[in-house]
Structures are given as structure tokens and as C-alpha cells.
């Protein structure tokens, strides 16, 4: 089922945010926002993302971190994590709430100190980290077409739906995250092998620092206790099979589907 968007009236930020949340709740699809909003840019997309977060907070959710989608040589994209998205190792993924899910291995940084840009370096970012975990993130786009732009993804909170971190955290000292790899395995076999340096500008801490500087331009900081996910790229999630990501240094994490 698709949600039809008006092409004659410029939607307001709050109404677009409400439609995205409604589509998620009802498992409905909608055209990419850039189809109806020709002027959709990153500034407007982040306003929509923040308004959607405000509406989620009003219904009782709490911010617990951010997702970082790093892009080579350009400013990373960020999305919000709330407590409603966090899964425990004993939880089953609520696949009945998803339309076309994907899954990706992520490095999860748990912050020990507040990180506020501008001017944050990778070294400063890593020094602010308390523990590092293996993780999995589940994505699920609201869009019915494949023509979505980067601002479309931002408005939809980077398609982030759920995340899970492994049972064991590691102090960042002594870890060489620039060489970290992870493979995702499902019942049908291994899907992919991912190098985090391929998408995180040679070290995931570079993405963490860039995210802090990006958030500062919008008046935000990365707070103590937050989880920051730095990922690779999602692969299709075969519903009904457990998914395990095995990391080279951070051990493994399994998501029950």
C-alpha cells in the first residue's frame, strides 16, 4: 500500500515528518519526498528529521545516540537513535513491523565524555569513547521507489529502525579499528564481508569526529552515555533466519529474527 503525497501544496515540515512516521507505523510506502518537494536539500531534510524526532519524543521516546553514515570525502549523514530502537540480545526482531528490511554490521561507540564540535579530531573523538561494541543495525525505508536522494534518506532518519550491540565491550586503547572487518552470516550462508575503513575515511573515529562537527552546525552535541553507530552498507535481511556478524576484533553479535 502506498501513501499518496500532494503535488499541488508545498507540505510543511511537521506534516512531512508526521507522514513519514505514519507510514512507518502502518507499514505503508510513499514516494520519495524529492518527487513532491523539488527544493528538498540537506537543510530542509534535517529539519524534517528533527521534527520527526520531536514527535517521537512527545509520545515517550528518548534519544540515546546517533547513527553515522559516512561518505567518502564529504560530510557524513547522521540520524537519531531512540530507546524504542534498541534491542537486547534476548529480543526477537519485530519483523511484522518492517516492509523491506536490510541489515548491516556496525561499530558501536559508547561515549564516556561529551563530544561537541566544531574542530573535533579523530584522536579527540576516540579519547571521548568509553567502550566499543560489535553491533547490527536494521534498516527499513519508507520509500516506494529507488530514486531517493541523499536528502530523502536524511529526512527518513537514514532508514534506521532497530539496532543491537554485542554482549562484550572493549576499551578503545589497543584496538586497531582501521583494520576491523565483519562478515554477516544467515542460515543460507555468508552474505558479505565488510571493511569499515572503506566507508569511514580510513578509521571509524574519523566518522565519529566528522559527525560531532556536523551536529555542531545544527546546535547539537554527542552526549555522555550515547551510542554512536558507524556502519558499512546494508544487505537484504532474510526474515525468519538468525543473523550473526563476526568481527575481527570485537567478537560477534547475533540478531534473532
Question: What is the predicted function of each stretch?
Answer:
Residues 206-213, 224-227:
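Short, structured beta-strand/loop micro-motifs enriched in basic residues and often containing a Trp
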Residues 1-7:
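Actinobacteria-biased recognition of intrinsically disordered, low-complexity terminal regions
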Amino acid at each position: 500500500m502506498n501513501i499518496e503525497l500532494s503535488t499541488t501544496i508545498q507540505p510543511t515540515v511537521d506534516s512531512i515528518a508526521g507522514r513519514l512516521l505514519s507510514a512507518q507505523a502502518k507499514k505503508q510506502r510513499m514516494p520519495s519526498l524529492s518527487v513532491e518537494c523539488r527544493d528538498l536539500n540537506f537543510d530542509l531534510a534535517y529539519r524534517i528529521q528533527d521534527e520527526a524526532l520531536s514527535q517521537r519524543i512527545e509520545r515517550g521516546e528518548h534519544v540515546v545516540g546517533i547513527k553515522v553514515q559516512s561518505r567518502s570525502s564529504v560530510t557524513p549523514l547522521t540520524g537519531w537513535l531512540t530507546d524504542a530502537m534498541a534491542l537486547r540480545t534476548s529480543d526477537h526482531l519485530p519483523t511484522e513491523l518492517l516492509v523491506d528490511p536490510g541489515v548491516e554490521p556496525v561499530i558501536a561507540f559508547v561515549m564516556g565524555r561529551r563530544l561537541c564540535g566544531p574542530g573535533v579530531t579523530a584522536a579527540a573523538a576516540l579519547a571521548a569513547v568509553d567502550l566499543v561494541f560489535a553491533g547490527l543495525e536494521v534498516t527499513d525505508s519508507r520509500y516506494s521507489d529507488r530514486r531517493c536522494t541523499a536528502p530523502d534518506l536524511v529526512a527518513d532518519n537514514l532508514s534506521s529502525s532497530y539496532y543491537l550491540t554485542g554482549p562484550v565491550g572493549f576499551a578503545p586503547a589497543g584496538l586497531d579499528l582501521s583494520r576491523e572487518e565483519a562478515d554477516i552470516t544467515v542460515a543460507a550462508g555468508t552474505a558479505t564481508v565488510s571493511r569499515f575503513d572503506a566507508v569511514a575515511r580510513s578509521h571509524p573515529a574519523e566518522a565519529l569526529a566528522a559527525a560531532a562537527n556536523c551536529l555542531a552546525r545544527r546546535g547539537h552535541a554527542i552526549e555522555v552515555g550515547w551510542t554512536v553507530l558507524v556502519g558499512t552498507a546494508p544487505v537484504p535481511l532474510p526474515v525468519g533466519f538468525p543473523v550473526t556478524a563476526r568481527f575481527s576484533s570485537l567478537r560477534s553479535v547475533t540478531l534473532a529474527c
